[in-house]
């Protein structure tokens, strides 16, 4: 099963048993008819396991740059070491599915890497990235991005991005989506931290929602 979820299953067992006990042709055919349900269940199970493995492994995005490097090396190891081993052992279908899925995903991210002349698309294994002063991070597709930070720095992904002035500060979205999210507001919190609000849409109003700090006038009356 380790060297092929599709082909190294019941068929291999039937052939090995037939050769070892020297079964006649009629006995082999009868044995194959008896194991048809098991063969079908095994093939379906193998297909599901392989599909889940390929989908997860090809699209997985790590949470840090170092882990992304490890995952990239693992994908190359699967393509250049594991898949040839599958071909050598006769698991042609498994090797073809895994190899095509990983190479197809790699070609897709390589296209965006070539288009924007940036290898981070390949390392992050994504078709869309957000850039802030040369640093890159994943982009979730939202039109409003709120980042934490402080005076003259922003926490961007796993990096700290320092800046002198926030006048020209913006998020550059590149890849499958292209947009420039400009810095619209900077919100200073009581603990000294700041929230930086980036968006393409203009802010038309801000409402303070700290209701527990609002004092009501006991003598206020309602006039009709």
Swiss-Prot record:
Domain CoV 3a-like viroporin CD: 128-203
Segments crossing the lipid bilayer: 40-60, 69-88, 95-111
InterPro entries per record: a/bCoV_VIROPORIN_3A-like_CD, a/bCoV_VIROPORIN_3A-like_TM, Coronavirus_Orf3a/b
Record keywords: Host membrane, Membrane, Transmembrane, Transmembrane helix
Bilayer topology annotation: Multi-pass membrane protein
Annotated ranges, domain CoV 3a-like viroporin TM: 34-124
Location(s), subcellular: Host membrane
Pfam families xrefs: Corona_NS3b
GO annotation, cellular component aspect: host cell membrane; membrane
Protein name: Non-structural protein 3
The species this protein was found in: Porcine epidemic diarrhea virus (strain CV777)
């Amino acid at each position: 099963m380790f060297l092929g979820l599709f082909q190294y299953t019941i068929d291999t067992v039937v052939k090995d048993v037939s050769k070892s006990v020297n079964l006649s042709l009629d006995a082999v055919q009868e044995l194959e008819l008896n194991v048809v349900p098991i063969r079908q269940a095994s093939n379906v199970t193998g297909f599901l396991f392989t599909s889940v493995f390929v989908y997860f492994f090809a699209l997985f995005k790590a949470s840090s740059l170092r882990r992304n490097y490890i995952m990239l090396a693992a994908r190359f190891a699967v393509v250049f070491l594991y898949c040839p081993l599958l071909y050598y052992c006769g698991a042609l279908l498994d090797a073809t599915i895994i190899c095509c899925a990983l190479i197809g995903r790699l070609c897709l991210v390589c296209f965006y890497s070539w288009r924007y002349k940036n290898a981070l698309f390949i390392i992050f294994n994504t078709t869309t990235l957000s850039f802030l002063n040369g640093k890159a991070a994943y982009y979730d597709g939202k039109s409003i991005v709120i980042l934490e930070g402080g005076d003259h720095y922003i926490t961007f992904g796993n990096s700290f991005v320092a800046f002198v002035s926030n006048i020209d500060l913006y998020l550059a979205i590149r890849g499958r989506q292209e947009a420039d999210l400009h810095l619209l507001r900077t919100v200073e919190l009581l603990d000294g931290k700041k929230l930086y609000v980036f968006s393409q849409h203009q802010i038309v109003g801000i409402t303070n929602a700290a209701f527990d700090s609002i004092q009501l006038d006991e003598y206020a009356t309602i006039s009709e």
